[in-house]
Amino acid sequence: MNEKRRKIVKFISAELSSICARLGDVEDEEQECVDNTPENLQDTERYTHAEECVEILSDARAEIETVIENLEGV
């Protein structure tokens, strides 16, 4: 791979890192919401959806981190 394409890949990797950090911020905020939900509301659909969102965000971040690691080998 030539230098120009390597720079593009490095730029994309940096952008993915930024996206991953932003997703982490959203995940942390949603987790805080889940953690602070009163016990009497923990059996609601909204609470369950919030828990699912935290898991989805966590999984997405893990996938992005894997992509970033793979790009480091380029």
How should each PLM-predicted stretch be described?
Residues 1-74:
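Long, low-complexity or tandemly repetitive, helically biased scaffold regions used
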